[in-house]
Curated annotation (Swiss-Prot):
Protein name: Photosystem II extrinsic protein V
UniProtKB keywords: Electron transport, Heme, Iron, Membrane, Metal-binding, Photosynthesis, Photosystem II, Thylakoid, Transport
Entry's Gene Ontology BP terms: photosynthesis, light reaction; respiratory electron transport chain
GO molecular function: electron transfer activity; heme binding; iron ion binding
GO cellular component: photosystem II; plasma membrane-derived thylakoid membrane
Cofactor: heme c
Residues annotated as binding heme c: C37, C40, H41, H92
Family: Belongs to the cytochrome c family. PsbV subfamily.
Function: One of the extrinsic, lumenal subunits of photosystem II (PSII). PSII is a light-driven water plastoquinone oxidoreductase, using light energy to abstract electrons from H(2)O, generating a proton gradient subsequently used for ATP formation. The extrinsic proteins stabilize the structure of photosystem II oxygen-evolving complex (OEC), the ion environment of oxygen evolution and protect the OEC against heat-induced inactivation. Low-potential cytochrome c that plays a role in the OEC of PSII.
Cofactor note: Binds 1 heme c group covalently per subunit.
Membrane topology per record: Peripheral membrane protein
Quaternary state and interactors: PSII is composed of 1 copy each of membrane proteins PsbA, PsbB, PsbC, PsbD, PsbE, PsbF, PsbH, PsbI, PsbJ, PsbK, PsbL, PsbM, PsbT, PsbX, PsbY, PsbZ, Psb30/Ycf12, peripheral proteins PsbO, CyanoQ (PsbQ), PsbU, PsbV and a large number of cofactors. It forms dimeric complexes.
Cellular localization per UniProt: Cellular thylakoid membrane
Length: 135
């Protein structure tokens, strides 16, 4: 992916600070997302719960909000339910449980960073990202 700085600048944290990715980070994140996440999250939709997508609006309404890079990294390490009440580490793939999710065993910290970063860039690349699922 060859993207401009505006497209590659994403929100870093809850304080609203931003970070600008490299095209290489976005490309690597996309590859890893496709390889590891699209089984349930094709185009940012959620196969197991059509009411919650990976669109920025839905991520912002999660508890805690997941619409920034550090919050998404936290989710990929320690997933919780949308309302933040339940630990989903045994139900949702994550890097903290390689005993349950061996397919994620070899992901590095940089890989997790790039996947989370791609999830924040993706809505700018595909207007259908996180959209409605039609049957």
């Amino acid at each position: 992916l060859e993207l401009d700085e505006k497209t590659l600048t994403i929100t870093l944290n809850d304080a609203g600070e931003s970070v600008t990715l490299t095209s290489e980070q976005a490309t690597e994140g996309q590859k890893l997302f496709v390889a590891n996440c699209t089984k349930c999250h094709l185009q940012g939709k959620t196969k197991t719960n059509n009411n919650v997508s990976l669109g920025l609006g839905d991520l912002a309404k999660a508890e805690p909000p997941r619409d920034n890079l550090l919050a998404l990294i936290d989710y990929l390490e320690h997933p919780t339910s949308y309302d933040g009440e339940d630990d989903l580490s045994e139900l949702h793939p994550n890097v903290s449980r390689p005993d349950i999710y061996p397919e994620l065993r070899n992901l590095t910290e940089d890989d997790v960073y790039n996947v989370a970063a791609y999830m924040l860039v993706a809505p700018r690349l595909d207007e259908r990202w996180g959209g409605t699922i039609y049957f």
